[in-house]
């Protein structure tokens, strides 16, 4: 299957595009022009590759999780260790690329949104490296959940704006960042943290994150002597780590691709963020994608134990993969993610981010189904340091509830 998405208008099949007001159209067209020029300039990629090697610490290892594999007794599990990047997650791949692009465009200021804080930290890090002014928009609810990352961003010289509109989470931070961009378009670049938003953002983010899948593909061959794994698994909120892993394999049809969505308290409750399980097409933040919405088209509140997954939409390329049945998207509950978090910590000595724990939880199920002759690559998108206190509080609260029930 030849795969050449997006088309010139930024559509992936019927998803994507750029649904933005005139005030933003100039900026996205300017960005697309600058991005095309950078793609055609070998020195841009050379400089970026050097930064990824020397500053970020790429390439990240592809690690055979022998203990986890033996514990489950199913397919071989290989972890793509994005948690070992500088700043602790995959977000730096995109942040560094976009700040370097903004610098080339002559921009002086950087703005970004963040949910779990990882994209905010990565953007603040890249802005510090390139000596650029940086403001991060973060929902007030997430500011509380991720106090440590807020301090990190401020330590790196960024200003953190707590957003008090709406549900005070990621989608509200995106709204605030877009408003700020409209007001300061001449000297400011907006760094979207996931593979969504108006074209060319989904393509730019995908391209900068595709280093994950390109490395993993070659590493798998070097490690196993086999051509391709049987499956790929990654967690999906907006979907940037997943698209980064999936895209280099999209034409390899023997490789099954699975995105683990946040099912929160369950997809049959109102408390989840399982966009492809329960959503339908709609326009959000400048792009046509699957969106959680009510019968009147009002955007529903997304919910997840993981701040990085509670977004009510999903990148348009994921909507397209789902539509053409190239990838499957599966719901994983908070409870299952917590089990994955503890299991990987216990058997491999690796504490994963709550986001990545959704992928681990599904990988455990899939490994049992596939059996020991098969193999899979799981994107370990980030480390769990930021989540340890939250998990501790949650597990203690759960234990107290159980104690009361037995009393």
Curated annotation (Swiss-Prot):
Which cofactor does the UniProt annotation name? pyridoxal 5'-phosphate
Domain of life of the organism in this record?
Answer: Bacteria
Q: Which Gene Ontology MF annotations are present? A: tryptophan synthase activity
**Class of enzymatic activity (EC top level):** lyase
Sites where N6-(pyridoxal phosphate)lysine occurs are at 91
Keyword annotations from UniProtKB, A to Z: Amino-acid biosynthesis, Aromatic amino acid biosynthesis, Lyase, Pyridoxal phosphate, Tryptophan biosynthesis
Concerning NCBIfam families, the annotation shows: trpB
Protein name, entry field? Tryptophan synthase beta chain
Native species of this protein?
Answer: Streptococcus pneumoniae serotype 19F (strain G54)
> What is the gene called?
trpB
